[in-house]
Amino acid sequence: MASLKDLRDRIASVKATQKITKAMQMVAAARLHRAQEAAQSARPYAKRMADILTSVAADVDGVDAPALMRGTGRDDVHLLVVCTAERGLCGAFNVQIARRAREQIKALLAAGKIVKIITVGKKGADILSRDYKSLMIDHIDLHAVKRIGFAEALVISQRIVDLFNEGAFDVCTLFYSEFVSVINQRPTAFGLIPMGAPKAAVEATDVVEQKETSKDSQSIVHEAIVYEYEPDAASLLEALVPRNLSVQIFRALLENVAGEMGAKMTAMDNASRNAGEMINKLTVAYNRQRQAQITTELIEIIAGAEAL
């Protein structure tokens, strides 16, 4: 049985830990607000960027589309870009992303594909290096970055483009955590390269005007809006494709930051609650032992007085 001094020391230690977890929870809550706003602001921009790309691609023949959009026509070599946090103390946030990537790696290897991995964030690199260190070809360190910006997305996208131009891979997939709510972050796999065939994009993004041509038949004629591009659509698409790649990566990074802060706030809140419960249990144990000690001392005093 622990002595009273040991119990006092443990209570003091847990209280000190609780102060730290509460402070970390408050910091995460403040950062979450900014990160959530940034992620939500990036979503419509990234979606509109993809819509514009698809619309322009509809006016370009498949053979004239940029290589990043067409791909190599093969799927033998897969590049997986796994984005996690630089630090821990955020529950299962990093583990869930790594688990999603592991599932993909196992499926690709079982299908006889070649897998290459680029990690963004220290925690993902630590987890994946345990089993797939030989597959990891690069690591992008963001430890010194205080606030994720578009410059970090450009670094990642440029590295991917360089590898693609070198013929290092056929298909590229980005793994990150989509921010749903403070308590819900969804591990997501997003295909970066190839971006999709223009022919498939036409049906999804045709803009039509509906005009009534006959009051009797109420028939509707759909007329597609035709755009003119300066310079030509192919040149515009060539410039938009790498930009879209950077934008989608930037959106994923912002989603990751928001998810990390949400997971960290939840984890620190749980830690603070657990510390409070532990303090209560230790305090009860301390009071019981102290009461028993006082009772024993009183009995000894009474017994000694009776002996006299």
Curated annotation (Swiss-Prot):
Produces ATP from ADP in the presence of a proton gradient across the membrane. The gamma chain is believed to be important in regulating ATPase activity and the flow of protons through the CF(0) complex. It is a peripheral membrane protein. SUPFAM superfamilies: ATP synthase (F1-ATPase), gamma subunit. It comes from Bartonella tribocorum (strain CIP 105476 / IBS 506). It is found in: Cell inner membrane. This is ATP synthase gamma chain. GO terms for molecular function: ATP binding; proton-transporting ATP synthase activity, rotational mechanism. CDD domains: F1-ATPase_gamma. F-type ATPases have 2 components, CF(1) - the catalytic core - and CF(0) - the membrane proton channel. CF(1) has five subunits: alpha(3), beta(3), gamma(1), delta(1), epsilon(1). CF(0) has three main subunits: a, b and c. Keywords: ATP synthesis, Cell inner membrane, Cell membrane, CF(1), Hydrogen ion transport, Ion transport, Membrane, Transport. It comes from the Bacteria. Pfam families: ATP-synt. GO terms for biological process: proton motive force-driven plasma membrane ATP synthesis. One of its GO terms (cellular component) is proton-transporting ATP synthase complex. The keyword Transport applies.
